[in-house]
Amino acid sequence: MADAASGARKASAHSQFGASGSPPPATATATGFDFGSYGRVGIGSDLRGHSGHAVNVVSFGSRLEKPAYLELNFYYGGMIGDDPEKRWRVVFVPGYSGDLFHATGNFSQNFAIRNAYAEVENLGVSGLSLWAGSRMYRGDDVYLFDFWPLDNLNTVGGGAAYAFNQKRTLLQVQLGMNRLSDWYQFQQVQVPARRLPSSTTVLSPQSATTTVTTLDRQRLVVSAKATQFVRALDQLPNGKIIVYGEFHYLPKGERQPEMVGQPPLPLPDDYGYVLGAQLGGWLRSFVFANLFFRHAGGLGAFGDLGRPFGFGSEQRVWGATENTLALSANYESQLLGVMAGGYFRKWSDANTAEDSGYSEGALAVRPTLYFTKYIHTAVELSYQVRRPTTVDQDAGRYIRPMVARASLIPIVAPLGRGTYSRPFIYGIYTLSWLSADAQYYLFEPQDVRAGRSIVHYLGLGVEWWFNSSYR
């Protein structure tokens, strides 16, 4: 009976944060400084003397050959007063992505701040938490494709969550803004200055100009999410139902022309939305299934960091749409673990005259045999296909790129059995078959990777996570 109760607690703790195998959130009870990390690093060859490379024709392809990505998670928090239920926490997460110095010899890296926020819990109202700052704001993922099909925001703002009904019901709201550095939201131009710059003299030939901001449009993104667990969180089996929505708004503006004498380009206000739902269930920890549906329109179809294109007649993207159906699942036993994931997406822009939209889908399954507690071997099989909506202009016909892949992955897992057991060190061999349309779609004729229907990838890699915050 004690083992069953312990398993229920473990499963419920896992389920509160997605039941998806994502890295768990920041520790909820630590006082003072705490630390966590997520990372993946790999190297590979195509067995033809070139760097190993991914061959994906869909928006979210296999994660096996993804480039290095690293995060360091720093936390500092404690109790409010003497009440252990009332807590505060500061989360700071720098992240790195790209080529490593040891591979390229270039001593410059691509860093970004992924999380920088503070939160308080149960202050004034039991079950209420408040946060503000810059944050990755995500739900459950499809691990095999490194894909968050329902809610995946990168926000600077704040939010609140309220858990009640013995934590079986959770309500969340978020409000944030961004101002992307692209022509659609921001512009600065040089204009004659009203006075000479301080760095020049009256006799200097340097022109007296200054930089002014002529376009500055902040996008507002508001989201709301409701989660209802089927049973109390300490009971198994269990399940949850999620409904989710977003609202996007971009105010009007005016863009200055590149050529002198041309009239400014008016940019009307624009809107977007996301509506979606998720159904999830689990028998025990890491034995689960999730089904997602997402419908997005206007700005919401591009995501919060997406740069709109394919405008309609009024320079709006209101007519753009995205529909996604996705699934993720995992099974664990003493000898075998099985991951599965897949999705279908249909995307269309707002330009009815020449739609750059597409339909795409991908499926993957990864069974893992546990030969010993620490030595495992996985086989991943996957298939992906993409169908652009319009005729390809160069080919003069509709194309349908397809890729089928098979990967063999020997694994050393120092923390034991489990498809989500991390860290793990692994070798990988992937054989990919590319249709003729996939070869045409992915590579220009001059590319050293072009003209191959069979692509090999032989490599080594490592992935880890511990005490990592993704919510």
Walk through the language-model features, giving the residues of each.
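Extracellular structured ligand-interaction cores
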Residues: 32-34, 67-71, 87-91, 113-115, ...
